[in-house]
Regions:
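Signature of N-terminal electron-transfer/Fe-S-associated modules in redox systems
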Residues: 1-159
Length: 159
């Protein structure tokens, strides 16, 4: 039986070749922070990290996660709030909240990659926009979301 590590725990993967990663995350493991919205990989609400890389879990076969490390929104921050999560709270960067988990996972990965490669420099609006280009917010909370992400960088807090 194949396994993956999800949020630090080793979990079995189903043998069903039709099973998607989102199904395992939400239905089998009851990690319901990850949302299924479009089912076509265009909204970003189902974003998780696979070996540190953001992927849309609604398109990824569960079997493709075998031997890999998966992080859901519940695992971001490793037991404490990530700088992005703190900034989202400070800026009230959500409305209905359905897109928020995907934005947080993507933004946290972007934050950590940026810090690792560019140190304390703050990304431009264009850099932030490019990092979030695969995410949709039906409520239009983009101004607050981008402000929160920018603050996560300006605060100088990494974790």
């Amino acid at each position: 039986m194949s396994t993956m590590t999800i949020n630090g725990r080793v979990e079995p993967l189903p043998d069903d070749p039709e099973s998607l990663l989102i199904d395992v995350v939400r239905d089998a493991l009851k990690l319901t922070g990850t949302k299924l919205v479009c089912g076509a990989g265009v909204c970003g609400a189902c974003t998780v990290l696979v070996d540190g890389v953001p992927v849309v879990s609604c398109l990824m076969p569960a079997r493709a996660a075998a031997g890999k490390s998966v992080t859901t929104v519940e695992g971001i921050g490793a037991g404490k709030l990530h700088a992005v999560q703190k900034a989202f709270m400070a800026h009230d960067a959500l409305q209905c909240g359905f897109c928020t988990p995907g934005f947080i996972v993507e933004a946290a990965a972007f934050h950590d990659r940026w810090r690792a490669s560019k140190g304390t420099a703050t990304p431009s609006r264009e850099d932030i926009g490019a990092a979030l280009s695969g995410h949709l917010c039906r409520c239009g909370a983009y101004v607050g979301i981008c402000a929160a992400i920018r603050e996560a960088f300006e605060a100088g807090v990494t974790r």
